[in-house]
Amino acid sequence: MTNNTRGYIQLHPFHLVGPSPWPMFTSFSLMNLALSLGLTAHGYMNNNMFMLLSTMTVLYSMTLWFKDIMAESTYLGDHTVAVKRGLMQGFLMFVVSEMLMFSSLFWAFLHSALNPTVEMGMSWPPAGMEAISAAELPLLNTMILLASGVTMTYAHHALMNGNRQNTLYGFAYSTLLMVLFVMFQGLEYTYAGFTITDGVYGSTFFALTGLHGLHMMMLIMMLAMCTMRVYNYDFTNTSHVGAETTILYLHVLDVMWLFMYMIVYWWGA
C-alpha cells in the first residue's frame, strides 16, 4: 500500500512494502470465484449472479492494488534499480512456472493421443468425436496473435525511442487484437461439438485452451493498464518495467498458442 511516512534513513535499495488489504481481499475474491464457478458448473446454483459478483470483486481489488503499485513506482520513487531487477526476475520465474504448467497439460494430451485405448475406439480423436477444424477459427486466432506480436514489437521499439504516440497506438491495437482473440475463442466454444465432460479428449482440449484463454484475459488487463499508463506519461524510454513484463507475457502466450495450434488443432485432430 502507498506509504508516505519516511521516519527512518533507509540503508538499502529495496522497497519495504507497507500494510495492504488488497492481497487478502483478492485471495478471498478468487476463492469466491472458484467456489461459485464450481457450484454453477455442477448445477447447484441456478444463476450466474454470484459468479459475476465474484468476478467484479476480483477486478476491483486488482485495480486498486495496481493503483497502489503504480503510485509507489511513479510518484513515490520506491522502485529503485534493485527493485526493478527483482520484479523482472520474479516475473521470469512466473513465466517459467507457467511453461511447466502448460507442459504438464501437453503431456496429458499427448499421452492419450499417442496411445489411444480400447475405450476410445483405438483412435484419436476418440470414435464419435468431431474435432474442431484447424483451418477455421483456430487459424484466424493464430493470425490475430501473430498480428498482435507485430503491433507489440512496434510499440516496444517506439517506447525505446521515446515515441509516445506510436507506443500508445501499438498498445491500443494489441489490446484490441487480444479482445478479438478471446471473443473468437468463446465463439469456438459455443459451436464446439463436445464439452469438457466428453472423455479425455474434451477434458484435455478445454484444459489447454481454457487455461490459455484465462491467461489471455489477464493479458488484456495488463495491456489496458499499460495503455493507460502510456497515455498518462508514466513510462519513459529508460523506466518501463510494467511494459517490459507485459510484452514478454504476450510473446510467451503467442508461442504457447503456436504449440497448441500445431499439436491440439492440427496434429491432434
Swiss-Prot record:
Disulfide bonds: none
Pfam family for this entry, one: COX3
Subcellular location(s) of the protein: Mitochondrion inner membrane
Gene3D superfamilies named among the record's database cross-references: 1.10.287.70, Cytochrome c oxidase, subunit III, four-helix bundle
Membrane topology value: Multi-pass membrane protein
Catalytic class of the enzyme: translocase
Main subcellular location: mitochondrion
InterPro entries per the UniProt record, alphabetical: Cyt_c/ubiquinol_Oxase_su3, Cyt_c_oxase_su3_dom, Cyt_c_oxidase-like_su3, Cyt_c_oxidase_su3-like_sf, Cyt_c_oxidase_su3_a-hlx
Transmembrane segments: 21-41, 49-69, 90-110, 132-152, 167-187, 205-225, 247-267
EC number of the protein: 7.1.1.9
Catalysed reaction equations from the record: 4 Fe(II)-[cytochrome c] + O2 + 8 H(+)(in) = 4 Fe(III)-[cytochrome c] + 2 H2O + 4 H(+)(out)
Entry keyword annotation includes Secreted: no
Gene Ontology process terms (BP): mitochondrial electron transport, cytochrome c to oxygen
CDD domains: Cyt_c_Oxidase_III
Keywords: Membrane, Mitochondrion, Mitochondrion inner membrane, Translocase, Transmembrane, Transmembrane helix
GO molecular function: cytochrome-c oxidase activity
Stored PROSITE patterns: COX3
CC per GO annotation: mitochondrial inner membrane
Assembly mode: Component of the cytochrome c oxidase (complex IV, CIV), a multisubunit enzyme composed of a catalytic core of 3 subunits and several supernumerary subunits. The complex exists as a monomer or a dimer and forms supercomplexes (SCs) in the inner mitochondrial membrane with ubiquinol-cytochrome c oxidoreductase (cytochrome b-c1 complex, complex III, CIII).
Function: Component of the cytochrome c oxidase, the last enzyme in the mitochondrial electron transport chain which drives oxidative phosphorylation. The respiratory chain contains 3 multisubunit complexes succinate dehydrogenase (complex II, CII), ubiquinol-cytochrome c oxidoreductase (cytochrome b-c1 complex, complex III, CIII) and cytochrome c oxidase (complex IV, CIV), that cooperate to transfer electrons derived from NADH and succinate to molecular oxygen, creating an electrochemical gradient over the inner membrane that drives transmembrane transport and the ATP synthase.
UniProt family annotation: Belongs to the cytochrome c oxidase subunit 3 family.
Protein name (record): Cytochrome c oxidase subunit 3
Organism encoding this protein: Debaryomyces hansenii (strain ATCC 36239 / CBS 767 / BCRC 21394 / JCM 1990 / NBRC 0083 / IGC 2968) (Yeast)
